[in-house]
Amino acid sequence: MTVSRLARNTLIAAFALSCASAFATATDELRDFVRTVKSGKSTFTQTVTAPAGKQKVSNGSFEFSRPNRFRFVYEKPYAQTVVGDGTKVWIYDPDLNQASSRKVGDALANTPAALIVSNDIDKVFTLADQPSKDGLDWVLATPKQAEGTVRSLKVGFRNHALAQLEIDDSFGQKSLIVFNAFESNAKLPADTFVFVPPKGADVAEQ
């Protein structure tokens, strides 16, 4: 094995700069991502397009740790925090000082977050390879249970790093989440996925 080939394989093992051709299919790449990437963080831009064509753009940050722990922080245009602590999923709106929670199993079922933070995606989704587009390897994920609002998801990888999510929902909306400089197996503080409602907040728990 040449020095350059050895160096490339070392990078693949470290999940820094991997080569997409190391995977037979895009679904293999997704399954490898689930198996080997135990945590991650990134900033993101989310664009939601309504059936009539009107778009809403928001920005924020995202962190996760398997299984079922994650934090979405929306910063613009409206602040909102969504935290999954492994048991519950909390949604907090600081402008209204309102917090609500649901059991993680109910909140994550068939959602985009489940595709990223779950350990067994084949149990929840039917996976199918899609043509490469825009330099990304794409997988179509269709929920096996016809529940919730998500009809289908597409996840795109660039060099084994999570790059984009495309979401089609039952309201006819299309959402695109673009992850910027995704960091695999990031070391995250222990309190990243802890949420305590602020004093005086209106709290509703299910």
Task: Locate predicted features.
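Extracytoplasmic
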Residues: V37-S39, V57-N59, S65-P67, P77, ...
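Beta-strand residues in well-ordered beta-sheet regions across diverse protein folds
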Residues: T43, V73, V83, Y92, ...
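An acidic-aromatic
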Residues: S61-N110, S175-L176
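Gly/Pro-enriched, hydrophobic low-complexity segments
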Residues: S100, K123-Q206
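Short, solvent-exposed helix-to-loop capping segments enriched in aromatics
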Residues: L108-D122
